[in-house]
Amino acid sequence: MRSREVSLVLLALVLCPAPRGSAAPVTAGRAGALAKMYTRGNHWAVGHLMGKKSVAESPQLREEESLKEQLREYAQWEEATRNLLSLLQAKVAQGHQPPRWEPLSIHQPAWDSKDVSNFKDSGSQREGGNPQLY
């Protein structure tokens, strides 16, 4: 659809060339000083409005940019998935077994809370020191 619009615009430009001369034609009665002062047009906003319409504001370009960004993100996710899959396959090939998970209630503490004699004696083994400082 876009190519049809572009071709119609190009055809219109070829068939209807713009007149050569000043940008805004001046009537014969005012052709004196006014034509010399405002050679590019007699409206004060001509200079202010020139170039104000940005190409980036076009909805088609925004849509294309968002599609490109979505494609980049998709490619990154695809690469990350491939990397993760290759890591998992490498672990399976090595015969790595994931640890078995047990409920926390089955675990017992590594030391018996009633047997604290080792903690009291550890400071007294040092020569001439205060056991509480070590």
Swiss-Prot record:
Protein location: Secreted; Cytoplasmic vesicle, Secretory vesicle lumen; Cell projection, Neuron projection
InterPro entries referenced in this protein's UniProt entry, alphabetically: Bombesin (IPR000874)
Coiled coil: none
GO biological process: mast cell degranulation; negative regulation of voltage-gated potassium channel activity; negative regulation of voltage-gated sodium channel activity; neuropeptide signaling pathway; positive regulation of behavioral fear response; positive regulation of peptide hormone secretion; positive regulation of phospholipase C-activating G protein-coupled receptor signaling pathway; positive regulation of respiratory gaseous exchange
Cited Pfam families: Bombesin
Sequence segments annotated as region (Disordered): 98-134
One of the record's GO cellular component terms: extracellular space
Signal peptide location: 1-23
Family: Belongs to the bombesin/neuromedin-B/ranatensin family.
Chain's role: Stimulates the release of gastrin and other gastrointestinal hormones. Contributes to the perception of prurient stimuli and to the transmission of itch signals in the spinal cord that promote scratching behavior. Contributes primarily to nonhistaminergic itch sensation. In one study, shown to act in the amygdala as part of an inhibitory network which inhibits memory specifically related to learned fear.
Protein name, UniProt field: Gastrin-releasing peptide
Provenance organism: Ovis aries
